[in-house]
Amino acid sequence: MFFISKLSLSNIHVRLTAKGLLRNLQLLSGCKLAVGFLAVDKNKSRTNSKNPQPPTNGQPDLVPPESKSRNVEYYKAQCEKKNQTIRQLENTLLSNNRRFEAVAVVIKHLYAEHDEVMKQRRDLSQELVTLREELVSSGHSCERLEQEKEDLRSAFDGVLQKVQEQHRLDLADLEERLKTFYSTEWEKVHQAYQEEADKCKAQMEQQLEEIRSKHEALKKELESSHIEEVDGLKQQFEESFKGFKQSHEKEMQNLNETLKESEETLSNQIQDLMTENDSLKEKLNAEVKRRMELAEKTQDSHTLYLEQELESLKVVLDIKNKQIHEQDKKLMQIDKLMERNVKLDECLKKLQQENEDLKARMDRHAALSRQLSTEQAVLQESLQKESKVNKRLSMENEELLWKLHNGDLNSPRKISPSPSLNLQSPRTSGMFSSPPVSPR
């Protein structure tokens, strides 16, 4: 239907374009006729203007020359206008001819498309007929296949019933064979497991005895070495403490003696300086009195007095400077003694700290001995626990074997009926052998 409607629309379009072309041709023919008439009139006017007729009846021309010139100009203007219209018409004619040629080309193209569409329509109608024939044949084949399917289903149901009956018989036979096979295997495995359990029990008891003996020997060795170390540390501490104490006492005595000697020397020096100072003061007073007397005697010699006074002051300053230097030296010696005393105090503090460190080491050794005793108790408890765990594991292994036997009897379909099963021997399997107990 879509192709038919498309073809009808194309036909209508072709008809409309053809009608338009006919109208254009009619207009063009009318324009050509009008142009022909105008050209004929123009030629006639030109011939008339070129060949003027003689006056009829032999009468002279009564029109003045001015009116003749005006008529000529008027005709010239008319001719120019007609020429312009003719040119315009020629241009329109050329454009219309071009349009006509284009429309003719379009019409040819449309006719070619129309022919192609008609060919496609014929091909599609032929394909539709073939598809209908194929649909009819496929319907017949589908009915035939449905019939064959029903026949095969009935045959399959019969075969399935036979196979199910055969499978039930095979399962019953397999269950009986498995019961007999696993009963014999269970007896073999149980006997081997019992032998392996007895061996493991004997090995465990032997290992426990060896571990206990080793532990006792190690405990005795540790206790003896610990006691020896503690005694040696005590002796070293006492000897070092005595030596430090004696050296400290000697140094304190020496320091006290040096302090006493320095104090005595300093006190003697101070007394000597005091006596010297008193004697110098007395000398200075005597000198001042003497100079006062001399000044009274010789008031005119004031400059001499001043010079003598300056010299005496210089002597006194030199003496005072010497005394100050000596006192500085003594103070430096006292500072050195004080620093030495401070160093000795620091040595004493270090010795006391070392004494405390030795006491702390002794405490740590005592704590270590207590820790070793507690660890020994913990090891004994762990050995007891491991023996209990081994017993519990043996019980669990027996229970698992019993469950395995009962489970195999209850579900025989999951196991193949082949008698050559790859069963591990209980001596090589890791399920029946318990690992050796290692001390922590």
From Swiss-Prot:
Matching InterPro entries, A to Z?
A: MTUS1/CCDC69 (IPR051293)
Give the chief site where it resides: mitochondrion
Molecular function (GO) terms listed? Answer: microtubule binding
Instruction: Give the span(s) annotated as Disordered.
Output: 44-67, 407-440
Q: Where in the cell is it found?
A: Mitochondrion; Golgi apparatus; Cell membrane; Nucleus
Enumerate the UniProt keywords alphabetically.
Cell cycle, Cell membrane, Coiled coil, Golgi apparatus, Membrane, Mitochondrion, Nucleus
Where in the sequence does UniProt note compositional bias of the Polar residues kind?
417-432
- Give the top-rank taxon of the lineage listed in the UniProt record for this protein: Eukaryota
Positions in coiled-coil regions: 69-401
Name a single GO cellular component: plasma membrane
Quaternary state and interactors: Homodimer.
Role summary: May inhibit cell proliferation.
Family note: Belongs to the MTUS1 family.
Name of the protein in question: Microtubule-associated tumor suppressor 1 homolog A
Species the sequence originates in:
Danio rerio (Zebrafish)
